[in-house]
Amino acid sequence: MVLMVELPPQPLRVFYLQAEIQYHYLRERMQQIALPAAVIAAARDTFIATPKLKILLDAEGVARVAEAIRAAFPEARPDVIVIDPIRNIFDGGPEGGGENDNAAMMFFLQQRVEQLRDAVAPEAGIILAHHTRKLTKKQVSEDPFQALSGASALRGFYTSGLIMHRPDEEMSVRKLEIELRNGPALPAKL
């Protein structure tokens, strides 16, 4: 499945802040992808993945992660910052709202995620991995992006959203739904 039509002129510098998978399992999963040797060689200098972090992306967490990003890429800013998953580092702000609270989600996106990007690489793209709420298959088929926790705030924030789900629990096939805020609709991909 091809998602990008154009390839960047050089490998993108990616900082992958992950707070879910232990290092050895993450390494095993990466090895299972079986990337070409040239891609692996390029990634040695351009792809930094953290071990499973136990950090809250509050004001102190933003400062600590910004410092880690600068240390990982001392010569140039990252092109992409990945946060995976939102749930494990979520800070809903002074009201203490959860990720299903749209005001708390907007606080997190504006006061934590955007501040992190602005501190290290204002032009960087952001990829946020997020869990979905429990919905029926019918609800997901009608509007898959309502499955996002904090959906209204998230959908107002991103320029493109992807949801991967299994339309039939009896089969291993996954469906990728694509939502663009500033472009023509794209068909779902299997």
Features from the language model and the residues they span:
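Short, glycine-/polar-rich solvent-exposed loops and beta-turns at beta-strand/coil boundaries
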Residues: L7-P9, D168-E169
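Conserved inter-motif catalytic segment of the P-loop NTP-binding fold
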Residues: P8-F107
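Phosphate-binding/switch region of NTP-binding enzymes
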Residues: F15, V80, N88, N100-L190
